[in-house]
Amino acid sequence: MKIYMFMKKKDSKPYIVNMLDKDKITADVTKAKQLADMVIVLPHWGTEYVYTPDSNQNYWTQLFLSLGVDVVIGTHPHVLEPVEVVSDTKGHEMLVYYSLGNFVSNQDQKPRMIGGMAKMTLVKDETGCYVKNYNLTPVITQKLFGQKAITTYKLSDYTESLASGNAIRNDSGCSDFSLSYCQTLVKQILGDDYDESTSELNVSLHPDGLVKDTSATESSSSAK
């Protein structure tokens, strides 16, 4: 499977990533589609501390979809946001992780202790390349009382005992931080596909995976 990365800028500040620009994105995706088997976009976008995608994210999602992008993995809001599959009028489907939240954090509010690890199965066979299934594993930042130490646990490995020892409880309005709080918020954000018994969002798609239509130019979203 071929992978092609666009990151470095060709100007006087090559250490700064590209801003979201429609013309630049269109050119990059068009080139990437010629060079790679699949196109994955990782945008820095969205409104901080909000659990749902904003109008700006929706705009760029529709642009990515119209260009034939296969997967979007978003960051920046510092909290989890939903995961969904969107499709256009010609049948092309695109997987979107709107925000993975914080993998590790020293921020001072309960929701910012929760993040997620994206996982998906990409298949290449005689029919082409496609997403077979996708997953999100929630993670919890553990700040230790009296120590300058921070670590990360999978939510599936987290306990009420660990939660009671999380130094986030010292911060204003956070004394009730608990395992049940984390599970409730993750379920609220990820919806019915999230399985509290395994602490996983794990979605198996139809046998042929996501539909890939590289000629698609029109778009309208629908959630799976």
What kind of feature is each model-predicted range?
Residues M1-K224:
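Acidic, metal/ion-coordinating pockets
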